[in-house]
């Protein structure tokens, strides 16, 4: 059974997001708070995930451990039992036991005895009693989840205790201490810790203790501590223990924890103690097997308990007397009780418990300390994080023991922590693993172990802190250790340790000035280190204490500041990552006034230390290669400005450099920060007024203006920036690098780590390659929008500069420039100039009115000139068009052979060229050429010329047409950008012209068609300003028209807003666009065609092509942005300021809710339906931006939306669902909408009377779930149960969305319990949620499900397993689920079915009487079975439930017609499959309660007419009975579940892809390992998915009193005649094949294939008959029959002689062995047949063929055994009389033999009168044979059943047996013992299995992807391919956020003790 804990633990690894993982980790910790006794159970489950290969999994596991440990009370042995110092001498040193046995409490508080189960109380629970819940958990825990001991001491407790104490003492003596620790020796001789491990480190999980001690021993060599720091005798003893298997040697057992459902366990491998007498070969074999077991298990539960106690296996005498060997099952009648034997209970393993004497985490910490030195970096990383969490919360108890005084425990605590600190130092010294992907190296292990150090320092005394500091200091100053070659990784680790040490213990340094001075010197030394990463960490070390340093040690800052400035001045490496860290420290220090004063004092004596000298050193880093450095420079300069009152270092050059930063920067955040920095610089420069400002910038403004308006070209023709207009920090113009220099820079970039770099060019001339793409105008590399965005920001900055310029010079200097921009032949200067003017307008200064008016008129003048005829930046495209036109004319000349005089000439110059005149080539010329000119020239061609040249001419013509289209689209884009930019600038001035049409059109065109989001958003903002201005000036008519058009544009995108008249009424529209999200707008391709101004009503025609649809998306996005900006800016006054918007949104909804649709709504002229869709669509996009003050308007709309959800139109339901989901996500009315969802929408799911209502409700829930994600958690309980019922809905669309929604919610169920209640949830909903939670718990935990009490008297006594079967059927009934009861043959499936059907009919009748609801009205149930069993069902129903009205719908058509009128009044109708197929039209008219398919595997063929007929039946509950649900392949299972729950296993195609194909491929002998793996995984997956819906019990498991069934194969050798016939047939077959090969070469492939199939089938049939009897094939048609008969006659023999049929001979012998046919005369002369009227054995003889039965009857029984009495049951017996024959055979013991065909007698019949079954023939389908043999082996059988299978050796039958074995394997894998009952079936699995259903499409895609990858990898060699497969994925840099020092410090506990 999978518990909530299991699912939470799995989420640590499988959680889709970090939020889900963290929530799961938190809730695991909360479990520890509620159940403190679960400590080791929780830790044992979580700890294995620390070794995961996945980073996020390890982090989540560490957080879970932290949550667990945090909720464990602080372990303080002296708090509860203080011990005086003088008393400690007599106490043991390890566990402190004062008695011989651990302190044990029984349940009643009495002393524990061997007769009772014990539960041990730990010190964690103080004096509280262990709860009964814990006792139940320990006693009922399943075998796979038992917690096993970490150390098993064997039977001798005293020896165990001594060894435990001895080991503890040795461990204590082996602890490292600072007094003897030599870090230099570790550095010199220690083994390096690299990134990965080899196979040599594989650990056998069954022998973990050996690995544990071996790893402990390995530390001696790894750390090179031989003889110096560990006692040799101790290590030798440990080594001896590792290698020996002595009695006292501790062993470790790690139980297997499987996340899959399968409980089948591999055979136990012998423990080391059992291996003593094994040979070397046997031991190696066991090792290999153990390694395979290790590789096969994903997660193992590790027991981390320090001690254990064994559970006693013996039971009390009371238990023995009360019938421990029996099951008691109460019956529906209170006076009945069934008593059954039960199998003996296997005693559970030892239960681990805690000891009062040991810190609870001791064992786990020891394991993690060993893992900290594991060769694999992932394991080291996980171990460090685990240690960090344990020490963080529980470090106080580390090393302490009970029985020691407080002082002694303090010493032990110090001793253990000193050992930990020494080990941490060793990791710093030896770790070499680092990630070089980011700007600076990140060393996960060194960072993580630094955090362990940080938490450990909380608990250690000061002397240990200083000792650790000295060790870390030595790692930094390695030259002091005498090392010739320093190790930068060790120095890096040392500095990391110091960084965390300082962060945690900084007060200690400030109280010891000598250590503080040493710290500063260490940092300065680190800053001078040649390694860049050491410098970076050194700078970060002082960053957290910069304020304290300034306050306490200001004098020491002087040297530090000098070093920091020197570091910045000395940057020569273009990849120096430490620069940003140095910059951060410097800016932090300089943010203090004291430091600035200190620098000023220093500057007075040393001018080189002034800011005017120092700050310019930063300027050359503004365009540094590394992003982090550029970001830090901007941040530092901003900090400097904010703290300085006088910034003398700020000049005009400073502003220009900031401007250039904006112009060239590609990173969005740095660009924005640069704008802010430039604004601050501008403000400082403007302090002395406009005149001073202008003077400072006079020499800079012109180049800034010129460079900012550089046109943006295309990838065909870029326009580079004029580098002479860009200056370096020195003030010199930027000199572009030569090609040689660029190549050098590129080669340097390729070296990610360069420790020693030669001197570069002098400062100021160094050329960084980061800006080359921007400088070169490389649009293809940078992207046109990114480049434009930078230019626009620069232009806005220039506008603000002009706004501060000297007033009388603004127009004089800047108007000509701006006029040139607006009249430029390029489009870019127009856009940028307009933006500059707009920015100028935004400067608030009344003195600028005249200048603004002048520039406004300039805009008005230029606005009239747009659009222009052409743009210079499109000249290159026009040249391309001209070249293509010229090629077309040349084709007419060369290919068409026209004379040159007839061909027109083209102008050489194109429009836009500098020398172009009025007759220059333009796009109109090109259009004319491919139009009338082309037609005229074609007419001049002769027919032969046309034939020769038409193809070439058409190709070039269409090329020209394409180029024209490209040019026109580009031209239109430039027109829109220019007109929108000018119009937006005009609107900003707040002075609207009288005529607004052109302005509105310019901005609206940009909103509709602009592809660049920055321009579209700007136009949206301008339109918002325009609307606001119109309302201010009382021009509402204009603004209302604009708003209505915007609303119409929002709805133009038919992918988001459907067309009302195109949508039908049935179905769910979301299923047609389930992959469409609301956030896919970025994928718009941008091919624009539509340029109409008006909103077209005919959307379908205007949006027909792909490009038109993309244009509609752009329209929708632009209009959406505008409305959203309006909502954000207008706030709560939105609807009062823009009342027309309120009308568009709410009026259509209100009208529909009040009166519905008018009758003419379906007419094309009626727009009511479309208006409603549009209103909901707009509200959907707008609601998230509405102010919370508008909540009342939105809440009042919710009831209207509820009405639309129940609309008859699918489009209305679709939009209502999306709109409702959007409201649930909004702040305005989200909680109210969710309340409505629970109260009103969810009940619609259960409306059986209306499919429309269910479709609307499920569509709404689907969209809410998809939108809210994790935020749906508080409401998940209201949804999960209703969705579960709808997953088997009669409507396919409802099923699909219910399953999809369920699959999304099911992953969140484990997280629900730990969440607080929403603050605004009404009390009645809270109460309802508690009921739902209780309901869900019953479903998830089968132990909490109440046993189903059968409310009707059943005339039979149910066995225990039958009652459990009825419970399972009741469970399905309760949750509206359906299933397969596939118990073994003979276990009473019929009886269990009758019980649930009768009970449900009774319950429905009772509910109908109480409520009168039509939902519970009487409806009959239908039993469909094979015709043979129809009578059997009638008999069983009349026997067990005589109160049910049963109608048998069987017989000829006339009789059936009479019964039809009675069927609806009957309780149960029994019919056959044949009748169901023929009369399906009558049966589908009735709604059935239960539809039961007996032997339901007959519908295995999904395409059969019978199957389709059965699946068309309608019923509330569906049940299949089948002892063999899978007979040949798993595809049959799909057909069965397609009847039960259509869609549950996906479509047949996806099922084939996911399951059938991989399983079939894995059978192939040539299959690869990956294919075999896929096959295995597919079998496991299908098993997991169908598990909860299939109940399977085997007779041997549930019937202890059922005698055994013995199956024996009886081999027969072929007779001479058979062998001769076989050889002749094979020879003839080979000859025929040769002849056919020659003939079929002339025939078609399909005919050949069909003939071959028929040929093979005939051959198989021939050989099958030959195995049975030669007479079966030697018919009258056989060509050799006469010759063989004559030959036999000569030998006095015949075809029917038994010697020719060895099977009949063997059958006769078997019958005689059974005592049949042995007629003889005894001594009294009396025939023995008369003496023994009844034989001891009775026999069933099965054959496949009726002809074979005839031969058995005539040739054997009648001819040679006349005294054997027999009956016969085959197809010749009428179905209605077959049950009568069965009854007669069972009741008359004088009948010796029953002859049957497998087809007729092998299904459903009870033939327990026989005890011997003989198969003369065998079925290809093994399940048919199994069913046949179980006719005798079933309930009621008192004798051992012997089954004999007659097999002809060396022939086809042996192959049939082999095929049967494979099919049995597949069937047993899918349906196995996990389907045994509610407890093992795991009803909770319902919440897991639908993940597969929801993701099936993705799975198919993954399979295809894997196959394509396999195909791609086939070209690689074996080694290369393995290496490629072994490469892990790159991890995300955001994972390193956990190494943030500030975040770490914030998590440290406030109180360490």
From Swiss-Prot:
Compositionally biased region (Low complexity): 113-130
Extent of Polar residues compositional bias: 242-276
Record domain Helicase ATP-binding: where: 1370-1543
Residues carrying Phosphoserine: 144
Keywords: ATP-binding, DNA-binding, Helicase, Hydrolase, Nucleotide-binding, Nucleus, Phosphoprotein, Repeat, Transcription, Transcription regulation
Region: Disordered, residue numbers: 79-141, 240-278, 730-762, 1078-1103, 1901-1920
Single GO MF descriptor: RNA polymerase II general transcription initiation factor activity
Subcellular location: Nucleus
GO biological process, one term: transcription initiation at RNA polymerase II promoter
KW Nucleus (keyword) present: yes
One Pfam entry name: SNF2-rel_dom
Gene3D superfamilies attached to this UniProt entry: Leucine-rich Repeat Variant, P-loop containing nucleotide triphosphate hydrolases, Tandem AAA-ATPase domain
EC number: 3.6.4.-
Binding-site residues, ATP: 1383-1390
GO CC, any one term: nucleus
Helicase C-terminal domain ranges (all copies): 1725-1877
Enzyme class: hydrolase
Origin: domain of life: Eukaryota
Motif (DEGH box): 1494-1497
Swiss-Prot/TrEMBL HEAT repeat ranges: 36-74, 358-396, 513-551, 554-592, 608-646, 1191-1229, 1270-1311, 1580-1623
Known role: Regulates transcription in association with TATA binding protein (TBP). Removes TBP from the TATA box via its ATPase activity.
Assembly: Forms a complex with TBP which binds TATA DNA.
Family of the protein in this entry: Belongs to the SNF2/RAD54 helicase family.
Name of the protein in question: TATA-binding protein-associated factor mot1
Organism this protein belongs to: Schizosaccharomyces pombe (strain 972 / ATCC 24843) (Fission yeast)
């Amino acid at each position: 059974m999978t518990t909530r804990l299991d699912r939470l633990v799995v989420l640590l690894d499988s959680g889709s997001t970090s939020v889900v993982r963290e929530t799961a980790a938190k809730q695991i910790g909360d479990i520890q708070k509620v159940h403190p006794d679960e400590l080791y159970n929780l830790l044992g489950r979580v700890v294995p995930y620390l070794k995961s290969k996945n980073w996020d999994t390890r982090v989540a596991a560490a957080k879970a451990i932290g949550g667990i440990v945090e909720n464990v009370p602080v372990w303080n042995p002296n708090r509860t039992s203080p011990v005086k110092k003088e008393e400690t001498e007599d106490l043991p040193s390890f566990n402190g036991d004062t008695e011989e046995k651990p302190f044990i409490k029984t349940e009643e508080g009495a002393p524990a005895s061997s007769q009772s189960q014990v539960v041990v109380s730990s010190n964690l629970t103080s004096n509280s009693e262990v709860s009964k819940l814990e006792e139940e958990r320990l006693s009922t825990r399943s075998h796979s989840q038992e917690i096993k001991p970490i150390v098993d001491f064997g039977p001798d407790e005293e020896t165990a205790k001594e060894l435990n104490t001895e080991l503890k003492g040795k461990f204590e003596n082996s602890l490292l201490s600072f007094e003897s620790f030599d870090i230099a020796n570790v550095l010199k001789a220690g083994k390096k810790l690299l990134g990965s491990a080899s196979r040599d480190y594989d650990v056998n999980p069954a022998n973990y203790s050996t690995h544990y001690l071996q790893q402990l021993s390995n530390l001696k060599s790894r750390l090179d501590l031989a003889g110096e720091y560990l006692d040799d005798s101790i290590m030798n003893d440990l080594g001896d223990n590792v290698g020996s298997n002595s009695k006292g040697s501790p062993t470790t057992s790690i139980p297997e924890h499987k996340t899959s459902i399968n409980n089948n366990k591999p055979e136990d491998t012998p423990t080391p103690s059992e291996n003593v007498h094994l040979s070397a070969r046997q031991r190696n074999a066991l090792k290999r097997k153990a390694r395979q077991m290790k590789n096969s298990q994903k997660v193992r539960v590790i027991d981390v308990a320090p001690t254990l106690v064994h559970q006693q296996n013996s039971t009390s005498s009371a238990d023995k007397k009360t019938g421990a060997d029996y099951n008691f099952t109460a019956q529906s009648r209170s006076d009945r009780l069934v008593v059954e034997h039960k199998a003996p209970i296997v005693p559970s393993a030892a239960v681990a418990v805690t000891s009062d004497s040991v810190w609870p985490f001791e064992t786990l910490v020891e394991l993690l300390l060993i893992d900290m030195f594991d060769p694999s970096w992932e394991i080291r990383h996980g171990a460090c994080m685990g240690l960090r969490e344990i020490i963080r919360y529980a470090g106080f108890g580390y090393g302490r023991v009970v029985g020691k005084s407080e002082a002694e425990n303090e010493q032990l605590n110090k001793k253990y922590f000193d050992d930990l600190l020494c080990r941490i130092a060793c990791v710093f010294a030896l770790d070499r693993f680092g990630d070089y992907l980011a700007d600076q190296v990140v060393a996960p292990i060194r960072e993580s172990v630094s955090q362990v150090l940080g938490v450990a320092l909380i608990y250690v005394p000061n002397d240990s802190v200083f000792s650790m500091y000295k060790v870390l200091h030595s790692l930094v100053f390695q030259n002091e250790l005498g090392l010739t070659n320093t190790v930068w990784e060790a120095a890096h680790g040392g500095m990391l340790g110091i960084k965390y040490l300082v962060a945690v213990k900084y007060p200690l340094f400030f109280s010891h000035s000598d250590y503080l001075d040493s710290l500063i010197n260490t940092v300065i030394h680190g800053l001078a280190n040649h390694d860049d990463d050491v410098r970076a960490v050194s700078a970060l070390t002082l960053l957290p204490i910069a304020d304290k340093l300034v306050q306490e040690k200001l004098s020491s800052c002087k040297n530090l500041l000098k070093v920091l400035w020197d570091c910045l001045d000395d940057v020569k490496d273009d990849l120096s990552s430490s620069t940003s860290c140095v910059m951060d420290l410097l800016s932090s220090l300089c943010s203090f006034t004291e430091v600035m004063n200190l620098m000023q004092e220093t500057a007075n004596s040393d001018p080189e230390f002034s800011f005017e000298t120092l700050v310019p050193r930063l300027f050359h880093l503004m365009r540094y290669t590394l992003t982090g450095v550029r970001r830090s420079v901007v941040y530092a300069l901003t900090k400097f400005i904010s703290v300085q009152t006088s910034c003398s270092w700020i000049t005009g050059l400073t502003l220009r450099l900031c401007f250039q930063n904006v112009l060239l920067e590609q990173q969005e955040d740095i660009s924005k920060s640069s704008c802010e920095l430039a604004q601050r610089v501008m403000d400082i420069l403007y302090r002395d007024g406009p005149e001073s400002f202008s003077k400072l910038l006079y020499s800079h403004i012109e180049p800034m203006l010129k460079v900012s308006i550089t046109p943006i070209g295309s990838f065909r023709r870029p326009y580079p920036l004029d580098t002479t207009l860009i200056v370096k920090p020195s003030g010199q113009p930027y000199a572009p690098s030569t090609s040689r220099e660029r190549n050098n820079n590129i080669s340097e970039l390729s070296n990610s780590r360069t420790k020693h770099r030669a001197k570069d060019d002098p400062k100021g001339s160094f050329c960084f390659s980061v800006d080359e793409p921007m400088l070169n105008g490389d649009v293809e590399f940078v992207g046109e929008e990114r480049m434009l965005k930078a230019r626009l920001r620069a232009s806005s900055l220039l506008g603000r500069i002009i706004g501060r310029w000297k007033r009388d010079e603004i127009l004089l200097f800047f108007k000509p420039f701006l006029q040139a921009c607006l009249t430029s032949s390029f489009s870019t200067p127009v856009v940028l100039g307009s933006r500059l003017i707009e920015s100028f307008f935004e400067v608030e200064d009344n003195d600028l009115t005249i200048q603004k008016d002048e520039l406004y008129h300039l805009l008005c003048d230029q606005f009239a000139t747009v659009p222009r005829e052409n743009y210079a930046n499109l000249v290159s495209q026009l040249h391309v068009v001209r070249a293509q036109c010229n090629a077309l004319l040349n084709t007419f000349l060369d290919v068409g052979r026209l004379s040159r005089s007839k061909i027109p000439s083209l102008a050489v110059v194109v429009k836009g060229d500098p020398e172009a005149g009025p007759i220059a080539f333009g796009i109109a010329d090109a259009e004319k050429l491919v139009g009338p000119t082309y037609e005229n020239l074609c007419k001049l061609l002769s027919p032969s010329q046309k034939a020769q040249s038409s193809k070439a001419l058409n190709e070039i013509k269409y090329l020209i047409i394409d180029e024209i289209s490209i040019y026109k689209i580009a031209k239109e884009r430039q027109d829109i950008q220019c007109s929108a930019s000018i119009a937006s600038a005009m609107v900003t001035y707040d002075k609207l012209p009288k005529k607004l049409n052109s302005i509105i059109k310019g901005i609206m065109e940009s909103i509709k068609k602009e592809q660049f989001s920055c321009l579209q958003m700007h136009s949206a903002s301008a339109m918002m300003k325009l609307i606001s201005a119109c309302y201010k000036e009382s021009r509402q008519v204009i603004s209302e028209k604009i708003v209505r058009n915007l609303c119409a544009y929002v709805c133009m995108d038919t992918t988001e807003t459907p067309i009302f008249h195109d949508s039908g009424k049935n179905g769910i529209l979301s299923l047609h666009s389930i992959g469409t999200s609301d956030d896919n707008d970025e994928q718009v391709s941008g091919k624009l065609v539509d340029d109409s101004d008006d909103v077209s009503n005919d959307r379908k025609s205007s949006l027909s092509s792909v490009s038109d649809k993309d244009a509609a998306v752009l329209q929708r996005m632009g209009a959406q942005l505008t409305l959203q900006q309006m909502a954000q800016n207008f706030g709560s006054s939105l609807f009062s300021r823009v009342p027309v918007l309120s009308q568009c949104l709410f009026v259509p909804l209100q009208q529909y809710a009040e009166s519905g649709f008018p009758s003419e709504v379906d007419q094309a002229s009626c727009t009511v339906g479309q208006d409603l869709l549009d209103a909901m669509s707009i509200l959907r996009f707008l609601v998230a931006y509405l102010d919370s003050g508008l909540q009342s308007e939105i809440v009042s709309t919710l009831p209207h939306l509820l009405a639309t959800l129940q609309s008859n139109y699918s489009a209305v339901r679709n939009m209502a669902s999306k709109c409702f989901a959007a409201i649930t996500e909004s702040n305005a009315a989200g909680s109210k909408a969710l309340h409505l969802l629970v109260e009103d929408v969810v009940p619609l799911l259960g409306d059986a009377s209306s499919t429309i209502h269910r479709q609307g409700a499920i569509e709404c829930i689907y969209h809410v779930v998809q939108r809210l994600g994790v935020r749906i958690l508080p409401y998940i309980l209201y949804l999960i149960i209703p969705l579960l019922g709808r997953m088997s809905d009669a409507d396919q669309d409802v099923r699909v969305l219910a399953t999809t929604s369920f699959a999304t919610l099911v992953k969140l169920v484990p997280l629900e319990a730990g969440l607080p209640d929403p603050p605004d949830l009404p009390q009645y909903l809270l109460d309802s949620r508690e009921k739902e939670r209780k309901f869900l718990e019953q479903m998830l935990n089968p132990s909490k499900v109440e046993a189903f009490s059968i409310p009707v008297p059943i005339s039979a006594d149910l066995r225990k397993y039958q009652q459990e079967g009825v419970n399972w059927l009741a469970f399905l009934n309760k949750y509206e689920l359906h299933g397969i009861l596939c118990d073994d043959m003979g276990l009473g499936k019929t009886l269990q079915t009758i019980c649930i059907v009768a009970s449900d009919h009774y319950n429905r009748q009772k509910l109908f009487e109480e409520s009168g609801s039509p939902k519970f009205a009487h409806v009959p149930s239908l039993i469909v079975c094979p015709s043979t069993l129809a009578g059997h069902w009638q008999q069983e129903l009349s026997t067990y439930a005589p109160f049910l009205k049963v109608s048998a719908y069987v017989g000829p058509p006339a009789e059936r017609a009479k019964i039809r009128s009675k069927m609806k009044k009957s309780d149960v109708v029994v019919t056959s499959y044949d009748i169901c197929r023929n009369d399906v039209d009558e049966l589908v008219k009735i709604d059935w309660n239960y539809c039961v398919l007996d032997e339901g595997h007959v519908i295995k063929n999904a395409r059969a007419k019978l199957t389709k007929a059965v699946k068309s039946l309608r019923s509330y509950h569906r049940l299949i009975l089948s002892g063999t649900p899978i007979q040949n392949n798993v595809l049959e299972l799909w057909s069965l579940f397609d009847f039960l729950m259509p869609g549950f296993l996906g479509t047949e195609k996806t099922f084939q892809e996911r399951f059938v194909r991989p399983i079939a491929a894995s059978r192939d002998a040539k299959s690869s390992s990956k294919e075999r793996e896929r096959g295995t995984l597919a079998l496991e997956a299908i098993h997991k998915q169908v598990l909860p819906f299939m109940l399977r019990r085997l007779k041997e498991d549930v019937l202890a009193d059922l005698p055994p069934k013995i199956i024996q194969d009886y081999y027969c050798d072929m007779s001479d005649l058979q062998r001769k016939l076989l050889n002749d047939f094979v020879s003839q077959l080979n000859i025929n094949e040769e002849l056919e090969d020659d003939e079929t070469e002339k025939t078609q492939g399909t005919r050949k294939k069909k003939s071959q199939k028929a040929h093979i089938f005939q051959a198989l049939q021939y050989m099958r008959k030959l195995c049975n009897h030669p007479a079966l094939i030697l018919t009258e048609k056989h060509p050799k029959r006469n010759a063989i008969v004559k030959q036999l006659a000569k030998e006095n023999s015949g075809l029917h002689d038994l010697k020719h049929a060895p099977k009949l001979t063997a059958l006769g012998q078997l019958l005689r062995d059974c005592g049949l046919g042995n007629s003889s005369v005894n001594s009294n002369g009396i025939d023995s047949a008369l003496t023994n009227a009844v034989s001891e054995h009775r026999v069933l003889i099965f054959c496949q063929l009726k002809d074979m039965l005839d031969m058995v009857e005539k040739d054997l029984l009648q001819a040679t055994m006349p005294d054997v009495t027999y009956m016969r049951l085959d197809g010749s017996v009428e179905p209605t009389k077959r049950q009568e024959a069965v009854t007669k055979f069972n009741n008359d013991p004088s009948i010796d033999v029953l002859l049957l065909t497998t087809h007729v007698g092998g299904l459903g019949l009870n033939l327990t009168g026989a005890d011997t079954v003989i198969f003369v023939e065998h079925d290809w389908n093994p399940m048919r044979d199994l069913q046949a043999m179980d006719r005798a082996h079933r309930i009621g059988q008192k004798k051992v059943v012997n089954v004999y299978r007659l097999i002809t050796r060396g022939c086809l039958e042996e192959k049939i047996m082999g095929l049967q074995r494979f099919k049995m394997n597949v069937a047993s894998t899918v349906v196995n013992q996990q389907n045994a009952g509610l407890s093992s079936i795991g009803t909770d699995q319902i919440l897991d299995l639908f993940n597969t259903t929801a993701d099936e499409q993705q799975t198919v895609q993954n399979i295809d992807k894997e196959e394509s990858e396999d195909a791609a990898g086939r070209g690689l060699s074996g080694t290369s391919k393995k290496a490629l497969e072994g490469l892990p994925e790159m991890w995300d840099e955001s994972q390193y956020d956990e190494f943030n020092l500030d975040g770490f410090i914030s998590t440290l506990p406030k109180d360490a003790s």
